[in-house]
């Protein structure tokens, strides 16, 4: 059953420390288990820093990709374009190309721009490649993770401090959720996979590997840290009990196991922001997806890359879909360390200090404080308007933060 014994040992060594220090404490453990697995992989995919990607997309596949792209509705697209404010001759980086909705909107607003279209998903990369053939001087497709973005950009000839606007549309795309074979959705049965990179890295653990290999305490830690699941112990116990009879390999199989740990009345008792019933396993699926794809560490790496490649006055727009993502984005823009317990910005700390310390001590603290690196475009986070939610209910939990690099 344990297809990845090294994965199991490395988890016990790294993740327990990661959880103890806080789910968003990225300074304490900047590399999770996935880094260690990659170092001990004998069969690796094509290097993520290569500009080449999947094999050529043929006409029948092109039609399918085009249909997928048309079905996807980009989240808060008007607000995104407004915040990026594209101007003639500017350069943009879409770090989560997906099906290209936001990139298309940027080009519709201002055709005379260059967009580097990055995505870790080979399917999204294929769509970006297809679109780049229609707009060869406006779009260049890049295949890779956030942590590989710097090398990809340098290889493409993009120097630090030269990009005018960067977009990050975080989380799982509708395209991934709607493909049962990808294993992201509990509503459609498929293999319990959840790897955003697809088969590019064959030895990367799948969600099935996680639920079949880790012990109860480890599983509960993942559900609690990444799904903010208050019933983490109960769900982990149900998973352990079920897998002792048969391996857990399908999405709806896992959903049924989680549901079986609760009375029938509780399975759809939770409500989303639209007051619609949600399945009790939703947070479990979120937690596994975040863990499998190392999403929080990748997000932090992506934010650091964005800061490095944006020019002074360049704009960063980040769309997040749950509190863990939003907390990291907020702290990064406000200059708050990921190890801090409270979300106090540098400016707030200085103000707090001035109320408590003497004038001399305050002056000393002012002289050593870190400079602010971002100016927020909006004081408060933006959320979807009613029409946005009506057009795209999946984007109901979106939070948009935008800032200008100082």
UniProtKB/Swiss-Prot annotation:
The keyword Methyltransferase applies. Gene3D superfamilies: Putative methyltransferase TM0872, insert domain, Vaccinia Virus protein VP39. One of its GO terms (molecular function) is rRNA (cytosine-N4-)-methyltransferase activity. Its EC number is 2.1.1.-. The modification Phosphoserine is found at residue 358. It is an enzyme of class 2 (transferase). S-adenosyl-L-methionine binds at residues 100-102, 119, 146, 169, 176. GO terms for cellular component: mitochondrial matrix. It is found in: Mitochondrion matrix. It catalyses: cytidine(839) in 12S rRNA + S-adenosyl-L-methionine = N(4)-methylcytidine(839) in 12S rRNA + S-adenosyl-L-homocysteine + H(+). The keyword Transit peptide applies. Keywords: Methyltransferase, Mitochondrion, Phosphoprotein, S-adenosyl-L-methionine, Transferase, Transit peptide. InterPro entries: RsmH, SAM-dep_MeTrfase_MraW_recog, SAM-dependent_MTases_sf. One of its GO terms (biological process) is rRNA base methylation. N4-methylcytidine (m4C) methyltransferase responsible for the methylation of position C839 in mitochondrial 12S rRNA. Involved in the stabilization of 12S rRNA folding, therefore facilitating the assembly of the mitochondrial small ribosomal subunits. Belongs to the methyltransferase superfamily. RsmH family. HAMAP family: 16SrRNA_methyltr_H. This is 12S rRNA N(4)-cytidine methyltransferase METTL15. It comes from Mus musculus (Mouse).
């Amino acid at each position: 059953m344990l297809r990845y014994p090294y994965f199991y040992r490395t988890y016990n060594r790294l993740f327990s420390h990661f959880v103890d220090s806080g789910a968003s404490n990225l300074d304490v453990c900047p590399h999770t288990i996935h880094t260690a697995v990659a170092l001990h992989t004998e069969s690796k995919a094509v290097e993520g820093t290569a500009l080449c990607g999947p094999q050529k997309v043929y006409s029948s596949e092109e039609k399918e990709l085009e249909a997928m792209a048309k079905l996807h509705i980009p989240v808060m697209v008007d607000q995104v374009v407004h915040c990026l404010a594209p101007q003639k001759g500017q350069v943009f980086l879409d770090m989560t190309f997906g099906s290209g909705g936001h990139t298309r909107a940027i080009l519709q607003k201002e055709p005379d721009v260059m967009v580097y279209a990055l995505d870790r998903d080979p399917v999204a990369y294929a769509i970006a490649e297809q679109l780049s053939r229609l707009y060869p001087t406006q779009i260049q497709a890049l295949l890779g993770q956030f942590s590989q973005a710097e090398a990809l950009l340098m290889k493409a000839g993009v120097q630090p401090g030269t990009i005018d606007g960067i977009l990050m549309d975080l989380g799982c795309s509708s395209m991934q959720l709607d493909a049962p074979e990808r294993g992201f959705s509990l509503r459609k049965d498929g293999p319990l996979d959840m790897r955003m990179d697809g088969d590019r890295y064959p030895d990367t653990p799948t969600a099935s590997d996680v639920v079949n290999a880790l012990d109860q305490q480890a599983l509960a830690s993942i559900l609690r840290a990444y799904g903010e699941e208050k019933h983490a112990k109960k769900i982990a116990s149900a998973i352990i009990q079920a897998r002792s009879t048969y391996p857990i390999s399908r999405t709806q199989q896992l959903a049924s196991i989680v549901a079986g740990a609760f009375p029938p009345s509780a399975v759809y008792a939770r409500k989303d922001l639209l007051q619609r019933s949600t399945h009790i396993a939703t947070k479990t699926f979120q937690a596994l997806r975040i863990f499998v794809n190392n999403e929080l560490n990748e997000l932090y790496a992506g934010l650091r890359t964005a800061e490095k490649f944006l020019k002074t006055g360049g704009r960063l727009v980040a769309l997040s879909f749950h509190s863990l993502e939003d907390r990291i984005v907020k702290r990064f823009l406000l200059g708050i360390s990921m190890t801090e317990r409270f979300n106090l910005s540098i400016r707030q700390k200085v103000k707090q200090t001035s109320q408590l310390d003497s004038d001399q001590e305050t002056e000393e603290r002012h002289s050593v404080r870190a400079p602010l690196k971002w100016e927020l475009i909006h004081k408060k986070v933006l959320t979807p308007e009613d029409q946005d939610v009506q057009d795209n209910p999946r984007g109901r939990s979106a939070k948009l933060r935008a800032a200008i690099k100082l």
